[in-house]
């Protein structure tokens, strides 16, 4: 009964903390404990959750998990202290009402099994009574009292030795006091300073950490990316980093708390113990805790930025139905070419040498023109790696000889080389060379960014900030969640999807994804959703979780084309029948006419389908193959080229956001180097974070602010240059 009450109490705390209703929180936890996935709950249990999205559901679950860990730790600490016979009612109350793991650890500290410390050694020598006597602040001389504890056998050779041991015990007593630690931690955070100085300049060859050679910033104000930069500089042995604390104020606080009689001769020894306890035990420990907390906050921010950038990259609009010529640029080894048809099938692989040292420019030109003509190429995708700009110039020259409209796009090829050398790429294209696979990946990345990018480790897609400096476990969890959310929001064509894409579908594991592809290759395309029930290891619960996200576009049942879950098919058929329609009318104008402007509230009562679900069903019936990505702005199509030398201050351009970081955004304006829009130049209004204004893949209007041709750098502004 106590556990049930405790759960309800924790849920109420969660409601207060996150601002959701008790019903929403309770249902999210219940649905998850019943084995439902986040995408499934978000899409198909809207009546239960009040239409919470994936991010909100995850926030509830993460906080709930922390609370459960906290409760487990409280129970363990209560048991451990209880076994020692030292659990008072007051201590129990403090532990039970603690809201952070750190508070529980502070309360447990005095009772923790310690390794041998100065204090434990002093206690072994029988000096605890002397420490207790000092804290009584009697009028007697402590040096005389200490003589009673001199004992050669116990290695207490003098009164000084005895007093030192007693001070060590008092120092640890001060350090173990939970309320003192809490006050010191809060005061240090409010008034402390993060400081860095140069340790070994020689190790900073590129002067990356120059601004931190002599740097100070209040702990309360330091921004996340500076915390991570300092940490990295310290790790690379370039910087010395520390927390400067308000020592005087802290010592005064401890003095006031510990010394009850200034006139007593004991006060001097207790003061020495306080100062030692703070400097030797509390300060290093609090500094570690604060730096750990700042690092965790900074890591969360870096992970959040990476996740947002990745989400925007994955959800870039696909260029559907286009025959694409992809070019993976290079100098010496030549530019690899790949033609992929409108389904992503590879039609042609080739190589050209338009650049030095080989430079067969005219031959390369003829070959590309022939390919464009033969395969009726509509788009050219150029990877943005080595030799990208020179290749762009070459393609622009080629296109001048093409009479119809053929556009080109610079495609972010980050991770393409990682993918092309992977086992997955070898399985997919066993007969192709690594560079040839890379060209195919670039072309397909333009046609369907999501389907292609899921094949690559998210950490390799080139939109992170300090991703190697953060908790890899936490980063992987967050990025996997982003990919899963994107894949399930878009939906998957079960007859064309790769294992890499299917494994992110709600409820599916990599093994089941492989089984689906194996069955498809063996028996041909699936014609109805129910056929998936025959897949090995795809049980009833897995089927329920995944099936709504898997589409069959040319199947026997038109509802299988949609995002409508089969659990609603009977209701949907009754709904259509009541309107004089059938499932064969899905997506047709007559159905659209019948459903547009319908009274959803009234229809919901008549059909017993919840309103939020009914709205989704109506949308799916009207636009069965709707892709949320199609509503976003298409990538920037190009025909001409721009050089760094062409740029002038104040020039107005359009560009594509390639990466967003704490201090601004990098924008591809068509020159060799992406330009930086500093956070201060993003908007006339105050911008708390660049992500509030821009996102990866967004097309933005910018003005050239400054050009450094020597370093190849361009500063941009999203505000007109006056």
What do the predicted segments below correspond to?
Residues 19, 317-318, 484-518, 639-677, ...:
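C-terminal accessory/binding modules appended to enzymatic or scaffolding proteins
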């Amino acid at each position: 009964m106590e556990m049930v009450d405790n759960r309800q109490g924790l849920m109420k705390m969660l409601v207060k903390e996150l601002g959701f209703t008790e019903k929403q929180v309770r249902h999210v936890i219940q649905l998850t404990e019943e084995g439902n996935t986040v995408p499934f709950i978000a899409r198909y249990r809207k009546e239960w959750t009040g239409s919470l999205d994936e991010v909100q559901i995850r926030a509830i679950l993460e906080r709930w998990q922390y609370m459960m860990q906290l409760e487990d730790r409280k129970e363990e600490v209560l048991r451990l202290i209880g076994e020692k016979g030292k659990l008072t009612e007051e201590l129990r109350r403090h532990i039970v009402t603690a809201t952070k793991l750190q508070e529980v650890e502070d309360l447990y500290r005095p009772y923790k099994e310690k390794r041998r410390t100065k204090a434990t050694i002093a206690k072994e020598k029988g000096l605890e009574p002397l420490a207790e006597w000092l804290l009584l602040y009697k009028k007697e001389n402590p040096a005389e009292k200490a003589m009673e504890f001199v004992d050669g056998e116990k290695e207490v050779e003098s009164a000084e030795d005895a007093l030192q041991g007693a001070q060590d015990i008092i120092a640890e007593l001060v350090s173990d006091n939970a309320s003192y630690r809490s006050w010191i931690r809060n005061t240090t955070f409010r008034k402390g300073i993060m400081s860095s100085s140069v340790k070994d300049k020689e190790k900073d060859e590129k002067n990356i950490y120059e601004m931190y050679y002599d740097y100070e910033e209040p702990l309360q104000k330091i921004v996340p990316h500076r915390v991570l930069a300092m940490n990295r500089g310290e790790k690379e042995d370039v910087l010395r980093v520390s927390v400067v604390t308000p020592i005087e104020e802290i010592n005064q606080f401890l003095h006031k708390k510990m010394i009850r009689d200034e006139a007593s001769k004991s006060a001097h020894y207790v003061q020495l113990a306080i100062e030692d306890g703070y400097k030797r035990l509390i300060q290093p420990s609090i500094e570690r805790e604060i730096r750990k907390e700042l690092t965790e906050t900074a890591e969360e921010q870096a992970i959040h930025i990476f996740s947002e950038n990745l989400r925007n990259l994955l959800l870039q609009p696909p260029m559907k139905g286009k025959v694409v010529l992809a070019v993976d640029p290079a100098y010496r080894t030549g530019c690899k070419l790949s033609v992929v048809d409108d389904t992503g099938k590879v039609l042609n692989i080739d190589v050209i040498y338009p650049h030095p040292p080989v430079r067969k420019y005219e031959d390369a030109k003829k070959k590309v023109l022939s390919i464009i003509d033969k395969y009726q190429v509509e788009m050219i995708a150029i990877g943005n790696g080595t030799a990208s700009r020179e290749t762009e110039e070459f393609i622009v020259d080629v296109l001048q000889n093409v009479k119809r409209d053929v556009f080109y796009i610079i495609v972010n090829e980050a991770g393409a080389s990682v993918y092309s050398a992977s086992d997955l790429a070898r399985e997919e294209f066993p007969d192709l060379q690594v560079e040839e696979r890379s060209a195919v990946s670039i072309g397909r990345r333009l046609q369907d960014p999501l389907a292609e990018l899921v094949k690559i480790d998210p950490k390799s897609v080139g939109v992170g900030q300090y991703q190697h400096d953060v908790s890899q476990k936490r980063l992987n969890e967050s990025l996997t969640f982003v990919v899963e959310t994107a894949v399930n929001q878009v939906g998957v064509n079960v007859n064309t999807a790769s294992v890499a894409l299917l494994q992110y579908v709600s409820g599916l594991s990599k093994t089941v994804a492989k089984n689906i592809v194996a069955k498809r290759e063996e028996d041909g395309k699936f014609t109805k959703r129910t056929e998936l029930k025959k897949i090995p290891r795809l049980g009833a619960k897995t089927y329920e979780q995944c099936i709504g996200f898997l589409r069959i576009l040319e199947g026997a049942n038109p509802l299988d084309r949609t995002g409508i879950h089969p659990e609603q098919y009977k209701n949907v058929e009754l709904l259509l029948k009541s309107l004089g329609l059938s499932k064969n009318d899905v997506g047709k104008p007559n159905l659209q006419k019948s459903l547009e402007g319908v009274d959803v509230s009234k229809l919901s009562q008549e059909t017993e389908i919840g309103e939020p679900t009914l709205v989704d069903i109506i949308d799916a019936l009207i636009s069965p193959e709707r892709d949320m990505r199609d509503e976003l702005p298409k990538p920037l199509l190009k025909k001409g080229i721009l050089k760094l030398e062409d740029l002038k201050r104040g020039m107005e351009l359009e560009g594509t956001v390639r990466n967003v970081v704490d201090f601004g955004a990098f924008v591809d304006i068509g020159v060799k180097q992406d330009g930086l829009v500093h956070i201060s130049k993003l908007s006339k209004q105050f911008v708390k974070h660049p992500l509030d204004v821009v996102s990866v893949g967004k097309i933005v209007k910018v003005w050239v602010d400054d050009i450094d041709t020597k370093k190849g750098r361009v500063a941009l502004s999203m505000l007109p240059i006056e």
